[in-house]
């Protein structure tokens, strides 16, 4: 039996990158999915490719009526909402704090934080009525380690993590789970400044490049989709209020000797053997 057979999900930012990978995986694993995205052509094309299991709904996550419409569409078509994946995002305001325009700061928080808030606001009443549900919010390792992303983006993602945790506590007695996923560097249009290009092309551009993390390969959207699948499935019914870091070990730091090439000549490191001294 498929992992999430018969479940219904709404995935914001579902037309590309992590969202697209998750849509594809969820459909493969038996779910029905609303692809909620502002990329109309790409979202509609993906839905057409996947057939009856996926429906596209144009959504700009700052607009409350559009977020609600996507959730209503899921309930109208399939009678329920098992998973709300608040994943839509963008890089946000750039530059030093003193140079960030207020309107760009506001837009960054509107998309990254308000978008998550609106998704949870309208998903929770449906889930309370049916007595179960899983909410997944996309954070970032920049929310837990400084210097991993633009400063306003990092602050907004930190807000997403705390909003996820406090919301999880408030709805746990309703059997609604709320968790966050913190991706590291993932080969997506957002991270590689290649919006509109196929994900395969993005991976090819990044192939062979090294990354400052214990697992040196670039992360792939499917890596995050697999974690989302776990959180949407019945395997995680006792998991809530948690932040799952999927980053190749980046947030854990870099092994000291990797940063100090001069010491590589001393490898392999001698392991103490109590029998030989």
PLM region spans:
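Catalytic Tyr-X3-Lys loop
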Residues: 98-117, 132, 136, 160, ...
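Conserved mid-core segment of classical short-chain dehydrogenase/reductases
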Residues: 68, 91-106, 129, 149-152, ...
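Short, small/polar-rich loop/turn modules that mediate ligand/substrate recognition or access, typified
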Residues: 172, 177, 182, 239-241
């Amino acid at each position: 039996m498929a992992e999430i057979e018969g479940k219904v999900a709404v995935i914001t930012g579902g037309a590309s990158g992590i969202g697209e990978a998750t849509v594809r995986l969820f459909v493969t694993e038996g779910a029905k999915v609303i692809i909620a995205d502002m990329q109309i052509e790409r979202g509609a094309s993906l839905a057409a490719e996947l057939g009856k299991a996926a429906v596209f709904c144009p959504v700009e996550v700052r607009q409350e009526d559009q977020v609600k419409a996507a959730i209503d569409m899921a309930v109208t078509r399939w009678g329920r909402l098992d998973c709300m994946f608040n994943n839509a995002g963008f890089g946000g305001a750039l530059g030093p704090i003193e140079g960030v325009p207020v309107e760009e700061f506001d837009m960054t928080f509107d998309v990254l934080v308000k978008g998550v808030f609106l998704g949870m606001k309208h998903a929770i009443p449906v889930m309370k009525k049916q007595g179960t549900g899983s909410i997944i919010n996309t954070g970032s390792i920049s929310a837990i380690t400084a210097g991993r992303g633009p400063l306003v983006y990092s602050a907004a993602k930190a807000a997403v993590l705390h909003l996820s945790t406090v919301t999880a506590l408030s709805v746990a007695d309703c059997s609604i789970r709320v968790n966050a996923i913190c991706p590291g560097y993932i080969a997506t249009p957002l991270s590689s400044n290649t919006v509109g290009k196929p994900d395969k092309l993005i991976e090819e551009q990044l192939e062979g490049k090294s990354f400052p993390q214990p697992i040196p390969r670039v992360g792939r959207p499917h890596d995050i989709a697999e974690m989302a699948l776990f959180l949407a499935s019945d395997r995680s019914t006792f998991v809530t209020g948690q932040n799952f870091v999927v980053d190749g070990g980046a947030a854990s730091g870099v092994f000291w000797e990797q940063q100090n090439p001069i010491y590589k000549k001393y490898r392999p490191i001698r392991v103490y053997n109590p029998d030989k001294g």
